Each structure stands twice: as structure tokens, then as C-alpha cells.
């Protein structure tokens, strides 16, 4: 079963948290920072931590994909750490995204 939740962390930003639970165990997860891009007139994903491909990693839109990260082995704790990281450093991630966009780097 997949559980999704949006957590508003500011007037122009939110976290999208997705947990896949099977037989009471957390199988996979993703925590994504989204920001309202005034130039595009819509929310865009800026950064996310997830378990796609079987390994915990971070993706940063326009910057890097599948960056290795040091997270706890426990999947639930790893998801909580990722959520805290994106919440606390949201401004840094958004500014890096904006800089990459200004340089003409492509979104994906």
C-alpha cells in the first residue's frame, strides 16, 4: 500500500512524502521538496531523497542524479532524516536550483 502526504513548509514550498508499505514493513520511500516557480507558474521539484534502484540517494533537479548519501540503514529513520534535511535546507536547495536554471541547465 502506498501512503502519500504533502507537508507545507512555507508559503511557496512543500514536501511530498511517499511511503510504500507491504505486510507492515516499509519497502520504499521518497521525500521530495517542491517549490512554486513564479517564472513557470507552477510547482517544480527541486530535490528528493528516495530508494529508487534499491539504494538511498539524492536527486537534485537540473544539478545531479543519484548522489550517494549517508542515511541510517533503517528505512523509516532514513525517511525521517531526509525529511528533516530537506526542511532545514530548503532555501539552499531552492537557490541552487534557481542558479542552475539561470545557467540554462535542463530540468529532468
Where are these regions (language model features)?
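Small/flexible residues
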Residues: 1, 15-18, 50, 60-64, ...
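Negatively charged, low-complexity tracts enriched in Asp/Glu with abundant Ser/Thr
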Residues: 1-39
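Amphipathic, alpha-helical segments enriched in basic
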Residues: 6-10, 24, 57, 61, ...
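Compositionally biased, intrinsically disordered low-complexity segments
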Residues: 10-12, 49, 97
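Compositionally biased, intrinsically disordered low-complexity regions
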Residues: 12, 26, 55-56, 106
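A short, structured beta-strand/loop element
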Residues: 28-68
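Acidic, low-complexity intrinsically disordered segments
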Residues: 61-108
Amino acid at each position: 500500500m502506498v501512503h502519500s502526504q504533502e507537508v507545507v513548509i512555507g508559503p511557496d514550498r512543500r514536501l511530498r512524502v511517499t511511503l510504500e508499505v507491504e505486510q507492515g514493513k516499509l519497502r520504499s520511500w521518497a521525500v521530495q521538496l517542491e517549490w512554486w516557480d513564479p517564472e513557470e507558474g507552477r510547482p517544480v521539484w527541486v530535490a528528493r531523497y528516495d530508494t529508487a534502484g534499491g539504494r538511498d540517494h539524492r536527486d537534485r533537479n537540473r544539478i545531479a542524479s543519484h548522489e550517494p548519501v549517508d542515511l541510517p540503514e533503517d528505512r523509516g529513520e532514513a525517511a525521517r532524516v531526509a525529511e528533516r534535511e530537506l526542511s532545514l535546507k530548503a532555501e539552499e536547495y531552492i537557490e541552487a536550483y534557481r542558479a542552475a536554471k539561470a545557467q540554462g541547465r535542463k530540468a529532468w
